Amino acid sequence: MRLAVICFCLFGIASSLPVKVTDSGSSEEKLYSLHPDPIATWLVPDPSQKQNLLAPQNAVSSEEKDDFKQETLPSNSNESHDHMDDDDDDDDDDGDHAESEDSVDSDESDESHHSDESDETVTASTQADTFTPIVPTVDVPNGRGDSLAYGLRSKSRSFQVSDEQYPDATDEDLTSHMKSGESKESLDVIPVAQLLSMPSDQDNNGKGSHESSQLDEPSLETHRLEHSKESQESADQSDVIDSQASSKASLEHQSHKFHSHKDKLVLDPKSKEDDRYLKFRISHELESSSSEVN
């Protein structure tokens, strides 16, 4: 309730305040309403003054057209315009002098624009004549980690003997030359590899010799792998044979026990139930052992 009362009070105060009427008229209309007589005379132009102002402009425009038809260069036309402007300035009043200068300045600006466009076309043509050729780049394997090996491989692949260098050479000569070049390259590569693979300590020497032997003789590794596979196969076969022999021995031993026990049962006819139980047990053991062997 308090808020509602406060809002109504504010609305009442706002409505009681005086409202100013906005004046939508322009500044000229305001001045005219305040001072009607002098401003009306200033705003309404005199027709005689208009004719005096337009006459020199028409004369200058006609003379400019004639000069433009007769002369082609912009510099001469500018000079003629300057002379004509001087004559007009001597004849006209101060107001006419200012307006004629404005018209001449506008004409000179137009001509300067035309001259600038002509200069731009000339410079564009000269720039178009000069054309720089595009030079292709060549990929060089510099900065690579395997630059030495990469360069040697590229040399060995791109080594070709042309007929122009050796016109009288035969195929045999070319092949011998190729072989000699490859042998030279291999001889050059061997000391570099030796220097790179040379360690500082004796342990490193042993490891380096072992690695070099592995690299030089890859057949040893394959032979070792084959030998290890053969040894594993032979061990597996021997284990199978041993298991079979042991199973056979156990079966024989159990059968021997069974026969001996059977003989005892024949001698002792009172223990028939025990014999049945033993037979069932022995048969079960035999079946389990046979299943294990299989």
From Swiss-Prot:
Compartments in which it is found: Secreted
Residues glycosylated per entry: T123, T132, T137, S219, S288
Residue list for modification Phosphothreonine: T170, T175, T222
Entry PTM: Extensively phosphorylated by FAM20C in the extracellular medium at multiple sites within the S-x-E/pS motif. The phosphorylated form inhibits hydroxyapatite crystallization. Dephosphorylation via a mechanism involving ALPL/TNAP promotes hydroxyapatite crystallization. O-glycosylated.
Source organism superkingdom: Eukaryota
Bias (Acidic residues) ranges: 85-110
Basic and acidic residues compositional bias, start-end: 174-187, 220-232, 263-274
GO molecular function: cytokine activity; extracellular matrix binding; integrin binding
Pfam family, one: Osteopontin
Record's keyword annotation contains Glycoprotein: yes
Ranges for region Disordered: 42-274
Family, similarity comment: Belongs to the osteopontin family.
Alphabetical list of PANTHER family matching this protein: OSTEOPONTIN
Official protein name in the record: Osteopontin
Organism of this sequence: Mus musculus
Lineage: Eukaryota, Metazoa, Chordata, Craniata, Vertebrata
Encoding gene per record: Spp1
